[in-house]
Amino acid sequence: AGDAVWAVGHDGTILNSRDGGLTWVVQREDVLDTSPDAAFDPRQGVPLLDILMLDANHGFAVGADSQLLRTEDGGATWTFVSTTQAAASSPADDQASQTEEVGNDDSWTLSEDDLAMEDVSDPHFNAIARTGSGALLIVGERGVAFRSRDGGASWERIELPYGGSMFGVIGYEGDHAVAFGMRGNVYETFDLGESWSAIDTGTDLSL
């Protein structure tokens, strides 16, 4: 949107620059209130991990614990959006998953038990992208993915062939998109997630 850029981070922070990044203003932050009489809000203090602006006014931010926020005024205000299916089970729930967490020792070699997630009721949403057709895709941990064909008004859970975390997604022309994540896994779709094809990266490193 011209010289306007956005960035997201910890404590639900959203920053905006109107001059190409020379100066920034805080549009939103949601720092965890640790005072003794504070009401518990599980969304407080949760980091945001990606942001997608569709134009100068409309956009979405995604983050940990299935956070999905929407703005219609250039980021002046943000509201929570429910995918309604974020906690739904999927075939990936029956697989041993792979997460970013490491054990308490100094070893970087993890067993499948080490990589298994105990609670995936609110999986992290790691990235969001728009395809050339205008559809939106969200990817997250443990193979979680969602798509929207109506500009984010409604969301549909879709299946990825890999049950580990996906860290990014890129939208191309039409319904073409590429998702990438743990252990060098990259998958490509030409039909907005109806089917996926693996792309050999030649690496087991996370992407």
Where are these regions (language model features)?
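Residue-level hotspots at or immediately adjacent to binding/recognition sites across diverse folds
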Residues: 1-207
